[in-house]
Every structure is written in structure tokens, then in C-alpha cells.
């Protein structure tokens, strides 16, 4: 495992973004032999970390957010315009880093106060509209949990349980 401080250029941020700029780290975990198994393990690791932080006495626990922990993607996000992104993250202009795909989403929230954690993209989606019914969507999914299935059988994957 390697922990990396992500290089940033905070001087390009606006006043609100700078006042709330998070500490940005990247974790690289090696030793996996199969991508599918690695993704499952990384998911469980992420959930365990999130639950431990959520249940801790850390004063900034409500601001903690794992942007990505995946074999497939690295996400760079912030309270930034798309033009600011490459200037804020020098990695994005470093020729050492290559990518087969880049997705930039720059729409700002219209009915919630902007925060780093709510900035686009999220781990699994970027969208062009507000998702106003998160509570409703969670309730809908929880009501159908008993009919959901996966070929991988482990019952401890419920996101709201402590791992």
C-alpha cells in the first residue's frame, strides 16, 4: 500500500472553494491477482474505512469522502470549473500519466449549497440534473433488497452495517 499526497495548486481556487479545500490523498494498494476479486475487496475496504470514520470521534468525520477506490478509475474532483481542473491538479497535465478516457462534468448544484463532496463526478455516475430524491431512491432499493441477488454470496455487504 502506498499513500500519496495529491499535488494541487490552491492558488487558482475561488474564495469559497479555498476556504473548504480538503486534504486530498490517493491510496494505491497492490498484490491483487484478479481484477474482479480486487474490486470486491476494495469495495469492502472502502466501506470499512467509511464506517470507522463515521463512527469515530474525529471532528471532521462528516467531511470525509472516499472519491474512488477502484482498479478501473481515478477520480479528480473539486469545486472547480472544467477550465480550472487541469490547473488545480498538475497530474492532469503530467505526460507521465495516461488515460484511455477522461470524463469532465462541470454543472454546479442549483438547489443545494456547493461542497467538495457534492462536486461532480461521483464514483459511478455524472449526471445533468439534480438527484432530488436520494431518500426515496434509497427507500425503494431497501424495500427490494430481498429480491436482489448476486452470484457472489456474502451478506455483510450492506452499506449501512459496520464491517
Language model features with spans:
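Conserved phosphate/anionic-ligand binding catalytic regions in large, soluble enzymes, centered on
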Residues: 122-140
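Extended, highly charged
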Residues: 1-100, 104-110, 157-158
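Conserved small/polar residues in nucleotide/adenosyl-binding loops
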Residues: 155-163
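Anion-coordinating catalytic cores for phosphoryl-, nucleotidyl-, and glycosidic chemistry
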Residues: 114
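Short, small/polar residue-rich loop motifs at catalytic or cofactor-binding pockets
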Residues: 118-119
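Short, acidic Gly/Pro/Ser/Thr-rich loop/turn segments
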Residues: 110-111, 141
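A short, polar/charged loop-to-alpha-helix boundary motif
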Residues: 141-154
Amino acid at each position: 500500500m502506498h499513500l500519496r499526497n495529491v499535488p494541487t495548486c490552491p492558488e487558482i481556487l475561488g474564495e469559497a472553494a479555498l476556504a473548504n479545500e480538503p486534504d486530498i490523498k490517493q491510496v494505491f494498494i497492490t498484490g491483487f491477482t484478479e481484477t474482479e476479486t480486487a474490486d470486491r475487496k476494495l469495495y469492502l475496504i472502502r466501506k470499512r474505512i467509511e464506517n470507522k470514520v463515521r463512527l469515530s470521534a474525529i471532528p471532521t468525520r462528516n467531511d470525509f469522502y472516499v472519491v474512488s477506490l477502484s482498479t478501473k478509475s481515478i477520480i479528480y474532483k473539486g469545486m472547480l470549473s472544467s477550465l480550472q481542473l487541469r490547473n488545480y491538479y498538475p497530474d492532469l497535465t503530467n505526460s507521465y500519466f495516461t488515460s484511455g478516457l477522461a470524463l469532465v462534468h462541470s454543472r454546479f448544484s442549483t438547489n443545494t449549497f456547493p461542497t467538495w463532496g457534492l462536486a461532480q463526478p461521483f464514483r459511478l455516475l455524472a449526471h445533468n440534473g439534480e438527484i432530488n430524491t436520494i431518500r426515496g431512491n434509497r427507500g425503494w432499493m431497501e424495500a427490494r433488497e430481498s429480491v436482489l441477488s448476486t452470484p457472489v454470496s456474502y451478506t455483510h455487504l450492506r452499506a449501512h452495517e459496520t464491517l
